[in-house]
Amino acid sequence: MDNEYDLETLAVRAGSVRSQFNEHSEAMFLTSSFVFGSAAEAAARFKGEQPGPIYARFTNPTVQMMEARLAALEGAERCVAFASGMAAILATVMGLMKAGEHVVASRSIFGSTVQLFSNILGRFGIETTYVSPTDPAEWRAAVKPNTKLFFVESPSNPLTEVSDLRALAAIAHEAGAWLAVDNCFCSPALQRPLELGADIVIHSATKYLDGQGRVLGGAVLGSQALMEGVYTFLRTAGPTLSAFNAWVILKGMETLSLRMDAHSRNALALAQWLETQPAVARVLYPGLPSHPQHALAMTQQKTGGGIVAFELKGGKDAAWKLIDATKMLSITANLGDTKSTITHPATTTHGRLAPEQRARSVWMSATDSSPTEIGRAHV
């Protein structure tokens, strides 16, 4: 579908392919394999001489529709879908790098991503150096002759730190490396990293792309050349997105723009309200003028997003007390749901990290009733 259409139209129409039955809603192909018309056709498919599905570990028509839609939303040449966001990150490294090479990564990233880089990839000879997400000079200083990848979340999980993606892209390319951006906190409705110079965009489709906390999924996007290596890892190792999950994500993307507008509006209102509360030590939300990278965020993002981080003056005990006192907020580590969620990252998603790496904030996604609910919990 021509990308001259607006994002709202692409979210509904891009990637749709009808079967011979001309269904209006995209079809879900629940099958492990596909039948060939002849031995010659089977051979041609496996050699890559003829297009068409072969085996569901390789791909599936429903998955392909989901990939095409997300590629249109991100402005990417190609998307490769995975069973989870973490599988997508692993595939990016394993598909494009080899032992003896080096990653420069933001030190403010998801806890499982730190575990992956430090404890798993390190065993296979891929070294990682962690640097400040907000200081491009640290990224430049960390570059080695064998550096192949820069990895960053912007905004970061959970402190919503915003990185200068244009600056990081320039430093990475000067070093002969790629810049990969985890765009989970924004989605393409709010930020398109490829337009800012990134080479690779990564998603946990579990979050805003699904939008209702129903299924797991992941995706890696970029040029055809880069994605060929990522796809080779998928085809060989098999962290494949199921047709059912792809269909759910495909339908979830139809309302992405509407949901992100509402998430952003509600999060801003919550952040503004939290700034007035005496028990709150600080509020971290990119849409607030008080956020350290507010000006930068507004040059990269459409809005501040749907996630608000805040610290209470009473520390962990106060945070737990608040969380336990809420009634209409779900205590869960997921984000991007239509239901408001709340968690304490230092003792959940980032609990296995060293103490100096843990965020002290409470972390929330918001609905329009969130200030009332937090108020009832006696912040």
Task: Pin down the residues of each PLM region.
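Acidic-histidine catalytic/liganding microenvironments
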Residues: L73, L274-P278, T326
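Conserved small/polar residues in nucleotide/adenosyl-binding loops
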Residues: A377-V379
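Conserved PLP-enzyme active-site core in the AAT-like
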Residues: D2, A11-V17, R78-A279, L284
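N-terminal "arm"/small-domain region of PLP-dependent enzymes with the aminotransferase-like
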Residues: D2-N60, S365-S370
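Conserved C-terminal alpha-helix-loop-beta "cap" of PLP-dependent enzymes
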Residues: R282-S369
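Glycine-rich beta-alpha junction loops
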Residues: S16, L30-F36, F185, T255, ...
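Conserved N-terminal alpha-helix of the aminotransferase class I/II PLP-enzyme fold
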Residues: S38-A87, S112-N119
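Short, well-ordered beta-strand elements within core beta-sheets of diverse protein domains
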Residues: I249-L258, G306-K313, S369-E373
